[in-house]
């Protein structure tokens, strides 16, 4: 293989790796003198639940390589969908990146960035040599998940899962529903005929994203969308239903009430499709494995898309 062929092969391999959609993280630590350091990475993965381990890789050509490979601690900050600017700060050269951020030092002396979807405060468990990179394996000492939708990365460009998902919604009559979860509870409201429903709103000309914003403003302003959970048609009403899986860090609501998932059998719902969807959600929430339902009011298929790690 010629040198040019080898270069082209590496480029093709990089492009192939780029076909895998990932989130965006900022990996942080502090030098012995307290100076904060960080770099962006999408090569993040959970490794183990017991003990709680995760990994991220760093290129040996990185100016931060020795600082992180020799560090006894580091943190993973998973960026939220509104934090493209934070990712760009760490992607560009700067004398003091952290001066542009709101952050705090953790118990283990790692910078934790404000407003992230989640953070993991780690001690270094192992550093593994891996070709032109090193794999940093961290032992999770503490973590927080805010429930915000994460910032995505695909083929060299950012995307936001919730906003991208709204693009698939057609111009037909659409009912938007928000499946807003908090821990082992789901937000429901009781209708005038004493049946239960999800927070919902008909999509108008201003689009699905605005409909979601209105639902959140009415029911739970701290909620944020993750991805489409169910898409189905009802031929009797000639209407399409879109349900977004959402999360909130707040256990109370402006309207409706949070109901324990174990109490679903005690309730009467507005229709059988909603009841079936909530029963599926209860099972998937327990397993921490989520899928998307495509079909009609009575039958369809579920495709797994998310399996939570650490």
UniProtKB/Swiss-Prot annotation:
Pfam (any one): Flavin_Reduct
Catalytic activity from the UniProt record: a reduced flavin + NAD(+) = an oxidized flavin + NADH + 2 H(+); FADH2 + NAD(+) = FAD + NADH + 2 H(+); FMNH2 + NAD(+) = FMN + NADH + 2 H(+)
Tagged with keyword Electron transport: no
Molecular-function GO terms, alphabetical: flavin reductase (NADH) activity; FMN binding; FMN reductase (NADH) activity; riboflavin reductase (NADPH) activity
EC number from the UniProt entry: 1.5.1.36
Similarity section: Belongs to the non-flavoprotein flavin reductase family.
Stated role: Involved in the degradation of the pyridine ring of trigonelline (TG; N-methylnicotinate) into succinate and methylamine as carbon and nitrogen sources, respectively. TgnA catalyzes the reduction of flavin (FMN or FAD) by NADH and supplies the reduced flavin to the oxygenase component TgnB.
Subunit structure: Homodimer. The trigonelline monooxygenase is composed of a reductase component TgnA and an oxygenase component TgnB.
Name of protein: Flavin-dependent trigonelline monooxygenase, reductase component
Gene (name only): tgnA
């Amino acid at each position: 293989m010629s040198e040019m062929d080898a270069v082209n092969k590496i480029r093709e391999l990089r492009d192939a790796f780029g076909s895998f959609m990932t989130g965006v993280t900022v990996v942080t630590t502090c030098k012995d003198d307290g100076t904060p350091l960080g770099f962006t990475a999408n090569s993040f993965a959970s490794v183990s639940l017991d003990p709680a381990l995760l990994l991220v890789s760093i290129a040996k050509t990185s100016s931060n390589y020795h600082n992180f490979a020799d560090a006894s601690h580091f943190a993973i900050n998973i960026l939220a969908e509104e934090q493209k600017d934070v990712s760009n700060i760490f992607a560009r050269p700067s004398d003091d990146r952290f001066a542009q951020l709101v952050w705090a030092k953790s118990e283990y002396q790692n910078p934790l960035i404000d407003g992230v979807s989640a953070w993991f405060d780690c001690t270094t468990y192992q550093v593994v040599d891996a070709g032109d990179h090193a794999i940093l394996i961290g032992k999770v000492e503490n973590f927080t998940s805010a429930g915000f939708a994460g910032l995505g990365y695909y083929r060299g460009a950012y995307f936001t899962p919730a906003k991208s998902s709204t693009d698939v919604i057609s111009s037909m009559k659409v009912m938007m529903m928000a499946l807003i979860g908090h821990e082992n509870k789901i937000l429901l409201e009781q209708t005038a005929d004493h049946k239960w429903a999800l927070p919902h709103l008909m999509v108008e000309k201003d689009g699905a994203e605005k409909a979601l914003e209105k639902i959140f403003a009415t029911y739970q302003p701290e909620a944020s969308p993750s991805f489409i959970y169910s898409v189905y048609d009802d031929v009797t009403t000639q209407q399409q239903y879109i349900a977004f899986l959402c999360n909130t860090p707040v256990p109370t609501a402006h309207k409706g009430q949070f109901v324990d998932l174990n109490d679903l059998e005690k309730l009467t719902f507005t229709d059988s499709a909603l009841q079936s969807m909530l029963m599926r959600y209860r099972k998937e929430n327990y397993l921490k494995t989520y899928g998307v339902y495509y079909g009609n009011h009575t039958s369809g298929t579920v495709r797994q898309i998310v399996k939570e790690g650490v």
